[in-house]
Amino acid sequence: VERLAGGERTATAAAVATRARELGLAGPPLLVSAERFPDGLAAGVLAGAVLRAPLLSTRRDELSPPVYPWLASYGTGALTVVGGPVAVSPRVRCQIVTGFQYSFLCP
């Protein structure tokens, strides 16, 4: 058993995503709201079982500090944001646009 943790939920997600990369999950990461768990639950299945991709989380109105450095270090140049603008705001989407190809999975 290996314990993966961070100082708060977005840091924990980044720690798990880092370990996933180390274990060979090489698909483009998915980004979900750290504040709305249903998106994360649904995306977890897609990320792990289908895409073999890491799952990151962020605050709705501000890109969480662990996310951008993770993307800069481990990202594939692509990112999928799961959820609509209520889950991940347009402001956060604008923060991640530079340097990444991205897509949105919205209801």
Regions found by a protein language model. Give the residues of each.
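Extracellular glycan-binding segments that recognize GlcNAc-based cell-wall polysaccharides
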Residues: 1-107
